[in-house]
């Protein structure tokens, strides 16, 4: 089984990460192609295409301009935000972290796909951002889908567990994916209707990654006992391709 999650806008390069054996992102040639485009933009252009403040545009312009000399950090320790904070990465054993290295893929607008211990540099680039004529979803789709097929071919249980947002999971081409895709949904009953509440769903996704790591889970079936923030598996609303957890 391979799980996918979205990268985060929030980064933490200040906090020291534990000493681990780091790996190199697999799509650096394509990353450098995107960097060339990003480096050509002015601060004002970055502000517009990324819909960010002038201050953030300045920060990212400086990052892109001197990208090779920026500090590096393992992806799973560099990203912050609700998903990553609820993995509680600092509490994972080396054994759990090594398991994630071969069972988790972080989808990124700049790097495409990242193993947890792949080194990244500080950046901002959401998957929905349009760079000139480049649609990032289309840009990465074949590369990431082919890579996932190669990884799952080596796995005992050949499932792709989707814990990413729609924006990021759209890089998976269902017509070229050779193995079963299992989507995970975290729902809440609001006014008689089941809805996804973004912040709670993100926390639950992170907690599920933590459970996968700590228990060395390699099958969606083993996640049906997952409970966090009051979520519980709903047989009624689930299917072979959809795992639905409803908050009580």
Swiss-Prot record:
It comes from the Bacteria. InterPro entries: YaaA (IPR005583). GO terms for biological process: response to hydroperoxide. Pfam families: H2O2_YaaD (PF03883). GO terms for cellular component: cytosol. Belongs to the UPF0246 family. HAMAP family: UPF0246. This is UPF0246 protein RAF_ORF0648.
């Amino acid at each position: 089984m391979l799980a996918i999650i979205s990268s985060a806008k929030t980064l933490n390069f200040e906090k020291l990460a534990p000493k681990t054996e780091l790996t190199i992102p697999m799509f650096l040639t394509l990353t450098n192609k995107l960097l060339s485009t990003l480096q050509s933009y002015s601060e004002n252009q970055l502000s517009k295409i990324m819909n960010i403040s002038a201050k953030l545009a300045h920060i990212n312009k400086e990052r892109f301009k001197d990208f090779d000399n920026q500090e590096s950090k393992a992806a799973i320790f560099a990203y912050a935000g609700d998903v990553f904070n609820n993995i509680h990465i600092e509490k994972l054993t080396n054994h759990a972290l090594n398991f994630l290295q071969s069972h988790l893929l972080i989808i990124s607008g700049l790097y495409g796909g990242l193993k947890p211990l792949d080194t990244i540099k500080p950046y901002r680039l959401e998957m929905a951002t349009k760079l000139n004529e480049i649609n990032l979803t289309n840009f990465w789709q074949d590369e990431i889908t082919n890579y996932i097929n190669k990884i799952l071919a080596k796995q005992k249980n050949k499932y792709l567990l989707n814990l990413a947002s729609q924006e990021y999971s759209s890089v998976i081409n269902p017509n070229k994916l050779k193995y079963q895709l299992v989507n995970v949904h975290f729902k809440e009953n609001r006014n008689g209707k089941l809805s996804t509440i973004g912040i709670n769903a993100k926390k639950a996704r992170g907690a599920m990654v933590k459970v996968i790591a700590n228990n060395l889970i390699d099958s969606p079936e083993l996640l049906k006992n997952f409970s966090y923030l009051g979520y519980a598996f709903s047989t009624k609303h689930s299917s072979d391709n959809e795992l639905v957890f409803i908050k009580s």
